Amino acid sequence: MENLLAATNNSVKYMERRKFITTTLKASTALTLMNVPAMVKAAGILNSDLTIQNIIDLILKEIPEAPFKETVDTIKSGNAANKVTGIVTTMFATVDVIREAIKLKANFIIAHEPTFYNHLDDVKWVENNKVVAQKQELLAKNNITVWRFHDYWHTYKPDGIFYGVIKKLDWQNYLRPDKGITLPATTLKNIILHLKSKLGIAHVRVIGDLSKTCKKIALMPGAAGGNIQVSIAEKFTPDLLIVGELQEWETAEYIRDAGLLGNNISLIVLGHTESEEP
């Protein structure tokens, strides 16, 4: 019996196929990376002839205007024509995740972020890269196909990553139509404690007075970049900007100076993976 798998950066969790499908079907209206088997079941083609390309095509049917002409969501390793023996979903297709997939006889890894250390997965990004070559060999030797699921997932309505984080934080009722968040008034410290508890984060980075009251929140998982982060801060004037990752000399210094100039804005940096993995 095949396994359908859900992998994190540090571990792989798995369930027997039928149990997994039953569980995910209950949440099929809120499409997540874990819902791939739910879509397969719904399409009525769950059988031994299912190929990797079949899985990809099913996912793309759920994405507005897919397939895109330009996207990083491409095959990074392997052959999409291969029959599926098992599926791993993960933030990063790390060597640990690949080895777990091998042990579990899963030949298809769906990763949200790059496999070869740069946004375009250009394996010639650094010439004669020994680590890239070793990773390629590990994947090829075990006939594992890696496909990135990034642009499509962020294009899904609502954005799959953003919705997942909002749901994990129990902030659905505070979400505004413009994607801003209006919380009951609370302190920056209390929000930090809530984030750490709900997301399982040991440490966050903060700029701001921990006793300051916050209501209006801008949540930006991942690494949108300094220009977009600062633009959101300027446009929506939130009390608190929560981001996944940033350039320290861009957004962080902007927030620091904004506060020193009397503007009521604080910053929390969660970490890229921590902000998107839920």
Q: What is each PLM-predicted segment?
A:
Residues 16-278:
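Active-site catalytic microenvironments in core metabolic enzymes, especially phosphate/sugar-handling
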Residues 1-19:
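N-terminal secretory signal peptides
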